[in-house]
Amino acid sequence: MKASSGDQGSPPCFLRFPRPVRVVSGAEAELKCVVLGEPPPTVLWEKGGQQLVASERLSFPEDGAEHGLLLSGALPTDAGVYVCRARNAAGEAYAAAAVTVLEPPAPEPEPQSSECPPPPPGTGEGAPVFLTGPQSQWVLRGAEVVLTCQVGGLPEPKLYWEKDGMALDEVWDSSHYTLEPDRGASDGGASLTLRILAARLPDSGVYVCHARNAHGHAQAGALLQVHQPHENPPQDPDEPPVRVIEPLKCAPKTFWVNEGKHAKFRCYVMGKPEPEIEWHLEGRPLLPDRRRLMYRDRDGGFVLKVLYCQAKDRGLYVCAARNSAGQTLSAVQLHVKEPRLRFTRPLQDVEGREHGIVVLECKVPNSRIPTAWFREDQRLLPCRKYEQIEEGTVRRLVIHRLKADDDGVYLCEMRGRVRTVANVTVKGPILKRLPRKLDVLEGENAVLLVETQEAGVQGCWSRDGEELPATCQSSCGHMHALVLPGVTREDAGEVTFSLGNSRTTTLLRVKCVKHSPPGPPVLVEMFKGQKNTVLLTWKPPEPPPETSFIYRLERQEVGSEDWIQCFSIEKAGAVEVPGDCVPTEGDYRFRICTVSEHGRSPHVVFNGSAHLVPTARLVSGLEDVQVYDGEDAVFSLDLSTIIQGSWFLNGELLKNDEAEGQVEPGALRYRIEQKGLQHRLILQTVKHQDNGALVGFICPGVQDSAALSIQESPVHILSPQDKVLLTFTTSERVVLTCELSRVDFPATWYKDGQKVEESESLVVKMDGRKHRLILPEAQVRDSGEFECRTEGISAFFSVTVQDPPVHIVDPQEHVFVHAITSESVMLTCEVDREDAAVHWYKDGQEVEESAVIVLEKEGPRHRLVLPAAQPSDGGEFQCVVGDERAYFTVTITDVSSWIVYPNGKVYVAAVRLERVVLTCELCRPWAEVRWTKDGEEVLESPALLLEKEDTIRRLVLPSVQLEDSGEYLCEIHDESASFTITVTEPPVRIIYPQDEVTLHAVSLECVVLTCELSRVDAPVRWYKDGLEVEETEALVLQSDGPRRRLVLPAAQPEDGGEFVCDAGDDSAFFTVTVTAPPERIVHPVARSLDLQFGAPGHVELRCEVAPAGSQVRWYKDGLEVEVSDALQLGAEGPARTLTLPHAQPEDAGEYVCETRDEAVTFNVSLAELPVQFLAPEAVPNPLCVVPGEPVMLSCELSRASAHVSWSHNGNPVKQGEGLELRAEGPRRILCIQAADLAHTGVYTCQSGTAPGAPSLSFNVQVAEPPPVKLVSELTPLTVHEGDDATFQCEVSPPDAEVTWLRNGAIVTPGPQLEMVHSGSSRTLIIRGCQLKDAGTVTARAGATDTSARLHVRETELLFLRRLQDVRAEEGQDVYLEVETGRVGAPGAVRWLRGGEPLPLDSRLTTAQDGHVHRLSIHGVLLTDQGTYGCESHHDRTLARLSVRPRQLRELRPLEDVTVHEGGSATFQLELSQEGVTGEWAQGGVRLHPGPKCHIHSEGRTHCLVLSGLGLADSGCISFTADTLRCAARLTVREVPVTIVQGPQDLEVTEGDTATFECELSQTLADVIWEKDGQALSLSPRLRLQSLGTRRLLLLRRCSSSDAGTYCCAVGTARSGPARLTVREREVSVLGELRSLSAREGDSATFECTVSESETTGRWELGGRALRPGGRVRIRQEGKKHILVLSELRTEDTGEVCFQAGPAQSLARLEVEALPLQMCRRPPREKTVLVDRRAVLEVTVSRPGGHVCWMREGVELCPGSKYEMRSHGTTHSLVIHDVRPEDQGTYSCQAGQDSADTQLLVEGDD
């Protein structure tokens, strides 16, 4: 495929989508994406549908195809979804990402107490925080390294260091590590410095400082890289390599690799000091680069990995390890196997600048060979960045817009995985980029390194767009490191290093470590000890879990299936389960399991069961009850368990087998209840004589009693609780109700402070507790303040009586009046009361009567008259009556302007076949207009309609066409209105297919994709996988009417993909899948063949498949074969082979070659061949041995079952006499156990007895051994105590025995003594020499010996790790440790205090662990403070122990409490010490125990309980003890309002009042009423009332529209829905309609009287509904309904109907027509031009009248010359194509009226 670009380009495509971003408020947020397209797309950013523009905080950086959105100082309002929209000429694409802005953590509140100064920064109570972290370093070998960290936190954290996940003392060679604590840092916090003296290459690695205290753990890491100093100048590559290592002593191993594959070498080296590793190739040191990776694996092995091997990589690779004790080598010879098919010209390494381009070029042997490009293991697809070009045999890869991450290894691959490799180097600010990806196990350390061109520059590390903290970043010169210690799954993501516009990215992947759950406890046992308890014991799991764990104990009642958790235990051992732990009495079983963070172990069930009984205790006892006479008395108590009890009243047992009972007939009634742990006794309606009754409760273990006290209840008002405001209209019934707490208690009513007197208009009633004042028909004078007074308390009512509101009867709608200058305008408003006050307003100002404005009144009708209206009189008029208004809009048009609308030019855009209407409004309804199009008068037709309606003139195009575009004029006299119509084609739509189509085809099938459009001539474009297709022989594009087709005549699998048919405004999608043809076996033709071969021999099975690329699988006897040296599989073109190079009889069987669709079977049989000697054992000829030495002669036959015979010098050899004959498979062996001189000669092994049978001979020579002697002498040695001593000598012959003696005693090998034999060299090694090992060492061989003297010098016992000052708190355990340079003998060191030996006891103990000596002080006391020392014979170290008194701390702090009014609150805290006395305070005032305040303490726990709380109790609760003070907040909230009783369903009659009522739990609360989910608002018909806790909703004059669902809501409480049903009133007609006859132009009035005044009616004329307005006026006067029809017309004749509900009345209206007259006549004289059109027009008095047109007295007939038109009252005569002969007199006859016009014609013919 050649690179090319189409003319149309490619639509935008997102290569990388923006990622969601989470930032803290005030930080910087950045979104990035990569978009490609041709031409380069325009990128816009949007939020909430609005395009974003650059500002001070918002910018849009671009870098080639990378586009970004940078938001500085992010605010919470900036959060949301941001859309990146890319658009070019070829299409559009978009992507979205969310930005989340988090609020910054709130600052810690400052302590209220000023007694203690605030702690220094970083040392506040809490988890450790790193103030200063270690910094990564790059040093030369031998340099000193100092890693320092400083940590804050309280309590002071414990610090320790790790290297590569191991503690420093676990590192093999850590003698040069020194830890220096510094607890006196000036800026606070703990500090621990790691100092490495004379750094070595093995010291390279990741160092992590851990900080841990009771509140948590923190860690920070740094990278240390130790480099070899550059001692020699760089070598000229043309010079031969200089040997830097010793020659190898043995032949290296050989390793073969195919070209383009990876080679991996691994060596494992041990030594002390830890050895330094170097890799060499052909003697030259290797350095890591892009294709050579050097690292150390998790098992400690050193690995060299050569990527994508090439021919130049062949050679000898050596791993050299050296330390101060010596060096060792390991080598391997690498051979690179080159493929047969090779690149004609391979790739060459290239370099390029960042943001530039590079070109990689190679040549293939044949232009038809397909190739693929890779960047390392990632396949590269063609795009704008990676342009792939094929020109003949040349293959090019052009990389555009280079970035740091483009640096790497690139490959071009042919078939057969033949590759050519090249390096691409990107020059820029970043020299060494990050790896593509990094895989790290969970918990390991992750290290990322970047090298920059300039030193000292500041880069930025981020993960998934979020900047990483500075504690894990380090920079030194050109190197930048990111160290992530102990990675977790949350650390995974895309890590980026940015430097200006350059960046490099890696994908950090964290692999989870699978942890096993802990094991179960063992040795579980149950002991039934004391009564009502059970003892459970167990042992910890084996092996114990690695992490912390607990034990979970569960119980199960026998007979139940449910297990219930009892409690959790941290330590193993025993636990006693009392009966109080179970809810009810029963037999219980128990089980236990181990739980840790890694899961739960299986349960272990304790054998047997235990019977447990819960013991009842009194949790909350009985209390004396005081109630009023007639109320219920409730006694209750709470027990600790569910148990039955008995109630007593005055010593008499109350029956509890019934829900209710009675002490005795006619006496006190009671009710007993039990809910769970609570028992209640309710004495109902107690009387005064029950005063002093004693109530008791008894159950097993509990007995309690209380007394009943009854008081005479004072009278009080139950309702209303507050003042009631009531509003009524005159004649309404008013009822004021006051409910008292006592029955028949007297009360007095007052009005305005005066006692009321009963009369017919005011009635006072008393009914039980309720007292009522009734006004049967309220009047305005009854308004006032009413009071119901009794026993000094009162209920108040404010009553307001008003006249009923006035309503406007007509008009009900907005009235629009149009008039011309000097016309009379009348505005009429009718109200329902004649005495109502009416006010008129114009444009908001009240009008006053004058010469130009006349105000009239006629009964309920009020009029405003403009006798001679002027344009300035127009405006907005209002008729205001009470709260109602009627609106009139008056428009006065000057005669000079006939066209009211439109005022300017109108532009109409339409789509073909749409309906277009042009509207022109005139000032008068009888005015005539003329319509023209592009200067020509239009003619009415089905395609063009002219309409006239009152003052409106319309031109209608029912189905507009393209040719209808143009300018239309509506002309009248000298005025015109202009309309410009533009008609366009409708957008193209795809009719078929509507959904995505999926097609499946087989190779070479014809695939047709069809798309049907809404337009025949619409163009389309076809795309495949986002690229526009081009028509070729393999892809044909067709067009047939509205159908468009894409045809693949012979589809191939690569033709599959997503096809898109793009019609501009619409697209259709097709998914095509083309599968390969069936895979067949074309040779052999037979499907089963029988083949025979010799064994052993070469067997080859061969098949040919079609197509040639088909995959096959081979089977033997039903099992798939595996490739090995004995079985090889081959494939070349269509041929597939299976080869057995050395077939044996056992290889016979059934072989099957199987493709996806076919198979062929080979039945292979193997016959044995004659016996042959395959190979003798590798022995010299002749074989020379010494007497007594064993001899073994061996050979191998071609068949294991063959028989052989042995002979010695021609004589048969027999078993025995020191000779042994053996057969081991195909091998035949002759063994001589101890050779002597008689065994010299020729030994022959012959197969078979036939003459000429194959044979094999061996020549054995037995000779005397050479004498044994020592060749070299031992050397005297002097070593230090603890070092190794090595004695070495050489012996001849090499196999001679050597005996070692020490001080004359034979040496026996052991842990300290080691003897080494290597050729002729003999070595004795004495490990860890001690002073007692000094003496003489002797080596003896044969008759010779040699001796040397060993001297052992005593080593000084010095302290490597010295004592450190320790600060401790009284009662803690303190440990002092030192580390010596060697392991000293017991008692080699001694401990001191104050310079004196330290006496040891149970609190002071010492211990030694190798090099470490430890002093332990358990439960340190204040007297233990002082100076402690540790000394040996050669060294001494001192440290100071400081002990501070035990401080009081809170282990569990106080917590804020929120309760409701009347509730109780409990505050509890736990201190670090017992027996502490503290004080509780509220709002700074000390609290003392009382009825509402309970204070108690138990051990370290202190508790405060406050009950009966009110709103005023909110505030600060504090606890003070010694120097400790802690506080919490108490918040008391109001009890939320609830709805006690909601509204009920109602059914009312239309016109009546509906009242909904609900009752609340509180008096002062606002209620919202809703109807059908919508809140209701006040209106004249809707009133709201509040009566104490009752809330009323009153709906007056209900109609059917009021029906629906009503509910009330208060706060969060909502009542259930209540349904209002409005019944229709039964209406009957009292006064029927009367038929009328009237003349045209007169008025007609119809009246109908019905039985109900609140009924609405409906009027009809001729079956058509009538509505007020124009000539129709409708009004209602009580029960009378009136219809007035003015300006009658003949067409008004018909039946008049009035209907009110089911009632109906009919009448007949007859309208007599007036004689037809002309209202407007034609001009007496009219002049027209020749060839033009003449129009004569008249207007008659009524529409439908007939007129007659005549010329010179002769009636004209319609035709092509004359056209008669009629529209309403207008009649026209149109004379077409006027000629001179058309001159004359034209007459129009309308009834008895006529008019003449003289037509004059001007112009030449």
From Swiss-Prot:
Domain Ig-like as annotated: residue spans: 12-100, 128-225, 240-330, 339-425, 720-800, 804-891, 902-982, 986-1075, 1078-1165, 1176-1261, 1266-1351, 1355-1442, 1536-1628, 1702-1798
Species assigned in the record: Rattus norvegicus (Rat)
Positions of region (Disordered): 104-131
Membrane-spanning segments: none
Name of this chain's protein: Obscurin-like protein 1
PROSITE patterns hit by this protein: FN3, IG_LIKE
Gene3D superfamilies: Immunoglobulins
Domain of life: Eukaryota
Classification via InterPro entries: FN3_dom, FN3_sf, Ig-like_dom, Ig-like_dom_sf, Ig-like_fold, Ig_I-set, Ig_sub, Ig_sub2
Main subcellular location of this protein, as a coarse class: cytoplasm
Compartments it resides in: Cytoplasm; Cytoplasm, Perinuclear region; Golgi apparatus
Bridged cysteine pairs (disulfide): C33-C84, C149-C209, C267-C319, C362-C412, C738-C788, C829-C879, C920-C970, C1011-C1061, C1103-C1153, C1195-C1245, C1558-C1608
PANTHER family named in the record: OBSCURIN-LIKE PROTEIN 1 (PTHR35971:SF6), SI:DKEY-31G6.6 (PTHR35971)
GO aspect biological process, one term: positive regulation of dendrite morphogenesis
A Pfam cross-reference name: Ig_3
Gene Ontology terms: cellular component: 3M complex; centrosome; cytoplasm; Golgi apparatus; perinuclear region of cytoplasm
Keywords associated with the record: Cytoplasm, Disulfide bond, Golgi apparatus, Immunoglobulin domain, Phosphoprotein, Repeat
Chain intervals with Pro residues compositional bias: 104-122
Region (Interaction with TTN): 17-19, 85-94
Limits of the Fibronectin type-III domain: 517-615
Function summary: Core component of the 3M complex, a complex required to regulate microtubule dynamics and genome integrity. It is unclear how the 3M complex regulates microtubules, it could act by controlling the level of a microtubule stabilizer. Acts as a regulator of the Cul7-RING(FBXW8) ubiquitin-protein ligase, playing a critical role in the ubiquitin ligase pathway that regulates Golgi morphogenesis and dendrite patterning in brain. Required to localize CUL7 to the Golgi apparatus in neurons.
Reported tissue expression: Expressed in granule neurons, with levels decreasing with neuronal maturation.
Subunit record text: Component of the 3M complex, composed of core components CUL7, CCDC8 and OBSL1. Interacts with CCDC8. Interacts with CUL7; the interaction is direct. Interacts with FBXW8. Interacts (via N-terminal Ig-like domain) with TTN/titin (via C-terminal Ig-like domain); the interaction is direct.
Modified residues (Phosphoserine): S10
